[in-house]
Amino acid sequence: MITFGEKLRYLRRKNNLTQKQLGMAVGFPEKTADVRIAQYETNARTPREELLRKLAQVLGVQKEILTVPVLTKPTEFSAAFFWMNELSLK
């Protein structure tokens, strides 16, 4: 499964932003902006709801693009399909 940090790094690079630029755009002080974004990209920190909203806005995506799991293995697809089917029967 693709992690939050991997998605964040991909979208940051796609938008041609440095870690410092992204960090400052979401409100981190210039001195620590790059370190904070690096922590999220390496999954050392988990962003709160407000930060997720800001990141999505700056990166030009819906918040769910950052938060919803991305399935990459056949077993993950099978499990997701199973639960979607089970939950739709209720």
Predicted regions located by residue number:
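Short basic helix-loop element that most often maps to the first helix and adjoining turn
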Residues: 6-27, 82
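Recognition helix of helix-turn-helix/homeodomain-like DNA-binding domains
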Residues: 27-46, 68-69
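A detector for short, charged/polar N-terminal pre-domain segments
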Residues: 1-3
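DNA major-groove recognition helix of helix-turn-helix/homeodomain DNA-binding modules
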Residues: 25, 44, 48-65
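Helix-turn-helix DNA-binding elements, focusing on the entry/boundary residues of the two helices
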Residues: 8, 19, 34, 49-52
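Short, charged recognition helix plus adjacent turn
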Residues: 57, 67-90
